[in-house]
Amino acid sequence: MNEAVISAKELQILLNQVDEISVMYPLYKHFDLFTAKQEVNGYRLKILQGIADFEEQQSHFSSAEMPSYEDFMQCLISAGIINYKNYDAFKEKLKAYMNLTKTILFSPDTNVLYHRFLSNSGTDPRKVLLVDTVREEIESMLNFKYSPQQIAELKKDAKYQNFLLDEFVNRRMKKSRIACIAVEEYRELRKFAVEIEGIEHSTSDKERNDIIIVKTLRRFEKERNLMPSLLTADRQMADLCNAEGLEHFLFNFPHAIEANFCSHHSMQRLIYNLAMIFGVIRLNSVVIFGEFKGKNSIDELKLRFLDDELWKSFDKNLRICRRLMSLGIE
């Protein structure tokens, strides 16, 4: 069996070898997610599945671990291919912030971190305010793992290629894989962002944590000549902000996925997101695992090649790239 464990960045080596892409979820019946054709500046996309298609496939499974339309949409948002429905309204609000005498700092909650909104929008990380309660909340979700019994139950429901699930025994569940993406974003932002402690330690109660985050930002605003603005896609969090008089912006999800083009970088990110959140996908003749036995780092993926010629070419290019990287040549 031809396999390679790679980093997310090394996905580009695989993408460079295929002009046309077809990505499917192998545990659903004939479930092609999208096709893409490479152009000079990126990829021409064609989304192939809608909400009804996902719901029909999910109906054959008793577990909430199977991919949903919302999961697919959030992978596209996190890759920067689609945006929140009211993103234009947020840009207008940004113009209003520029006229304030106070400096504005943007504070993302957990879901906005998962969507990588601040990175995708090019927000200066020095204008970001991180509450460590958010980090604690994310980290508490990182290590929920499948038991052998849970995998056995999933395999009973899966009628197609259920042997792929063997890789998931004692590996991260979906909510933990989602947390991995959020924690990556947090760690990247904190290099330059302002980070503050919560007014109390985080708890296992999400609603209580939301209150801690909002009250922490409100206290920060009172103590400093700065204005924090909480960014969220959670209406309950927005309601708390209203109650506390905290500046905020509530992002809304689009009703449906509308995407026909993406950059090369966004495609690389999308493949990584899908492999992580769906657990396993197939790109042309390559099975890509986001979670697998022996995984050591969040950004690792395992590629399983079903085409010997593609494997030989990929393996050769991977070795060359790694040799150049070891010499400090990028």
Where are these regions (language model features)?
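Feature 3881 marks metal-assisted phosphotransfer/nuclease machinery
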Residues: 1-108, 112-228, 235-330
